[in-house]
Amino acid sequence: RIFCIMIPFVHLHVHSYYSILDGQASISRLVDKAIADGMRGMALTDHGNMMGVKDFFNYVQKKKGGASKDFKKAEAQLKELQAKVQEAGTDPCSIVLDDGKTLADAMAETEKAMEKAKRVMDFKPIIGCEMYCARRTKFDKTLKEDRSGWHLVVLAKNEVGYHNLVKLVSRAWVDGFYMKPRTDKADLEQFKEGLIVSSACLGGEIPRKLLTGDEEGAEEAVMWFKERFGEDYYLELQRHEVKDPAQRANRETYPLQQKANEGLLRLAKKCGVKYICTNDAHFVDEDNSEAHDLLICLSTNHFVSDQSRMLYSKQEWFKTQAEMNEIFHDLPEALATTQEIVDKIEEYSIDHGPIMPNFEIPEDFGTEDSYREKYSEADLYDEFTQDENGNVVISREEGEAKIKKLGGYDKLYRIKLEADYLSKLAYEGAYWRYGNPLDEETEARIKFELHIMKTMGFPGYFLIVQDYIKVARKELGVLVGPGRGSAAGSAVAYCLRITDIDPIKYDLLFERFLNPDRISLPDIDVDFDDDGRGRVLQWVTDKYGAEKVAHIITYGTMATKLAIKDVARVLQLPLSESNRLCKLIPDKLPSDENGKVPKMNLPNAIAAIPELREAEASSDPLMRNTIRYAKMLEGNVRNTGVHACGIIICRDDITDWVPVSTATDKESGEKLRCTQYEGSVIEETGLIKMDFLGLKTLSILREALENIKLSLGIEVDIDMVSIEDPATYDLYCDGRTIGTFQFESPGMQKYLRELHPSTFEDLIAMNALYRPGPMEYIPQFIKRKHGIEPITYDLPCMEKYLKDTYGITVYQEQVMLLSREIADFTRGESDNLRKAMGKKLIDKLNHMYPKFVSGGEKHGYGSETLEKIWKDWTAFASYAFNKSHATCYSWVAYQTAYLKANFPAQYMAAVMSRALGNIADLSKFLAETKAMGIVCKGPDVNESFRKFSVSHTGDVRFGLAGIKGL
């Protein structure tokens, strides 16, 4: 069919692979196709959820960012060409450029490039959801008709609409879930502002009623929506005609659609409601239809060969404007009305600055109102734009921009109140940790850190973390780890007992945790004993409110092997062949000619492995199709889960900002709230993520301490044990570390016997070095400790930071400190250097190298020596370890070794009690216990407890739960 006029069209009913096991389309491919086809936008309307919305929004913003750069580049080129025209003073058609084009042609091409970029810049991501609307109310969950609901497409036309859609979808999950997440008309009426609604597919209320002959009921439904949504309510037409007689597809849908469409057009005219056409897209291209069919087989647990299984019409691809024009050539207004909807869509962002939860500060300390009376805006400006010593360090313009980024002066009063209270707690802790008065270095460090926390706007974060850690220790009886990750570099965190490692003593750096040159959210991971973690989370939920606390969703995708197995199963490829194909997939692909390791996916694996190429070209159609469709399904979302440790604590109801869904806790069976956006992007929306980790080793420590108390009547404060305990170092020197944390592998035992660690610093270094890559330096480290190899330094000043590791650079913090010592790098610059070296960012390193050399030369160091140091750093930096983390976990390891050395029976009983479900580990630990000379008595119904126990004589009694099958 030939058309004189192509009517613009956009897709307003689209499913991605976030319509889990129903949609097969990746968001990036959908957006790319829409842009390539010249569409002005597209909607994302996954079934019952908004899980793909952040991915959708981010990808469109990425495309727009690239287009903006292209536009500016082309604009600059056009100005240069126009200048040449003015300079020549002649017809641009007569001027020939070096590439043979005329100046006029070059200008036309440049203008065309600008137009193309502008179309992408103007592309509109339309956020929506195909919701399930309960046939009665969302609280009715008894009848068969309550199990799903009418389909309804809901689109957000502006920011208000987005937040209302978030509310609707969240409430559908939290309150209305019954087989499906269901909204109802009461909620639709309450949250209608800013929303555009269409009647959806054959599963919608109006089409269903029309098909059952209930014309009156259909009209009532249309009028209900029209009265509430007015001109933002549309009827939706679809046509999925199967034209290929040989194709196995659902041919019953199209006649029903045509019948429903007739009724919809009658109602549109009678009720004065406009109509649109959609294609209910579930996959991107026509040749993806069979892959989508396989996905439906996976979803419904059928083989492809099953004759009675569910079938789609296979017409549900993301059709081009031309294809939609052909299908709806007789209803041009249905195409044109999609443009009307696009025109209604406003530009807005779903991202937000940090939304810090409010920490309750005692009124006798101060309130926001009292601070407003006490401090002027000028006072706040000075405090938040000067350095910790009151020096002016930024311009007025930069200062005002900083105030605005922090939320304006109104927000600053809250931040200052929290910062002052944080300062009070920090100094109280500092006097307890370091004594009063503080020495000059400690005073300066705490003052600097508190200033950075305040001027970044995050004092409330630290107040909240120290609060739940304090409660965990003092009220809930939960063992808390000494810290993990870069947070241990903060002296303030140490003073607040967020961490238990002295960063000043161990040269741990605050800027490794918070870079003063770049505002970024703090990230404090906290370890709790895994028995007590749940109690801490419950306390947090009770304190802040269930509506303000949520877990974070995770998405399970079809990785390479899983895609092969899934496709092979529904195609009924023999299991032996499926397993053979999966075994061909390596854990890691070989490096290419440039030394880079390709991303693991099926196309790259096929390129690298001849046997997979043979399978792809096999004469066996089952084998060939397995590879073909596995490539198409690879990366599809297959299921959702819950982040192992990430928790959101919000100032407001979380559904004021992002959608939530629900999941079932595996242990308690309780329903958990989860954000529908995953952890990698959730903070972009302003929500604050905190990590609560369960560490089995802490449970072992806690249980060992209980065993000591029960059997010996002694209470041991594990956080206060001596760091110089001789028995503990004897244990390490002998390599008797089975059952201890992080030092129990045979290889580590061997190196410990060679090293003979005599200081805690030796243990930290071994913990950092015993990994692939830096492990090769361990023999040199051992030789230098024992004087077999001389300890050398490229510069005398390097001894200050390398002496504890015998002249070998082991930690990232050493590189940071030395860059400041040698070349006067700032704190922020040293952290940027650490990141650039660790990630091998060549451009950034090349930019920093001249500063390093010039800074070193100012101190009188030779350029050759500086070049050698730089090369050594860049070679080793990708292996260098985070000393803060190594120190924290070495302390936990030391605590386990201390208990094993000093309370062996009590400790090993705890270790075995935590290995009840693993016969191999239990046998290993039982053998170690006997080798230590401890009497291990068998199980006895009269004396055994569930777990392993220790008698007053020091014998270990076997726990009943350790008996297989009991």
Question: Where do the protein language model's features map onto the residues?
Answer:
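Alpha-helical scaffold/interaction cores of sigma-54-like transcription cofactors
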Residues: 5-966
